[in-house]
């Protein structure tokens, strides 16, 4: 018997969510071919002979653009439910959303002024 009776379904979903990836990994380990010859360990380059190593360093600029994208992607995730329920939330929720957007605009302006978005 579970202590919090209202959370039985949540516990069930949590157990299923933990079991599915483990089951997928175990199934893969059991059914995957075991061949480890030298050619299977090479990097795949669309059927061509691999040239050089697969480990290269990426420019840090890609990281900065990805970070800015993630920030504004998360902003969209937070603002979408607000936009759906906008008509029921009232003026206070509108002001809170404006403050949230203003903080992110200030962060974008700061990154822009510091040159984080420059590609030179």
UniProtKB/Swiss-Prot annotation:
Its EC number is 7.1.1.-. Keywords: Membrane, NAD, NADP, Plastoquinone, Quinone, Thylakoid, Translocase, Transmembrane, Transmembrane helix, Transport. It is an enzyme of class 7 (translocase). NDH-1 can be composed of about 15 different subunits; different subcomplexes with different compositions have been identified which probably have different functions. NDH-1 shuttles electrons from an unknown electron donor, via FMN and iron-sulfur (Fe-S) centers, to quinones in the respiratory and/or the photosynthetic chain. The immediate electron acceptor for the enzyme in this species is believed to be plastoquinone. Couples the redox reaction to proton translocation, and thus conserves the redox energy in a proton gradient. Cyanobacterial NDH-1 also plays a role in inorganic carbon-concentration. HAMAP family: NDH1_NuoA. This is NAD(P)H-quinone oxidoreductase subunit 3. It comes from Synechococcus sp. (strain WH7803). The gene is ndhC.
């Amino acid at each position: 018997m579970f202590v919090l009776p209202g959370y039985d379904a949540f516990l069930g979903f949590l157990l299923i969510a933990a079991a599915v990836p483990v089951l997928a990994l175990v199934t893969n380990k059991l059914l995957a071919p075991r061949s480890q010859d030298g050619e299977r360990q090479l990097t795949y380059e669309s059927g061509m002979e691999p040239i050089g190593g697969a480990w290269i360093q990426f420019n840090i600029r890609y990281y900065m653009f990805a970070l800015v994208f993630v920030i504004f992607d998360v902003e969209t995730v937070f603002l979408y439910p607000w936009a759906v329920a906008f008509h029921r939330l009232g003026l206070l929720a509108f002001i809170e959303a404006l403050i949230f957007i203003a903080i992110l605009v200030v962060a974008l302006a700061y990154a822009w002024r510091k040159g984080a978005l420059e590609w030179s």
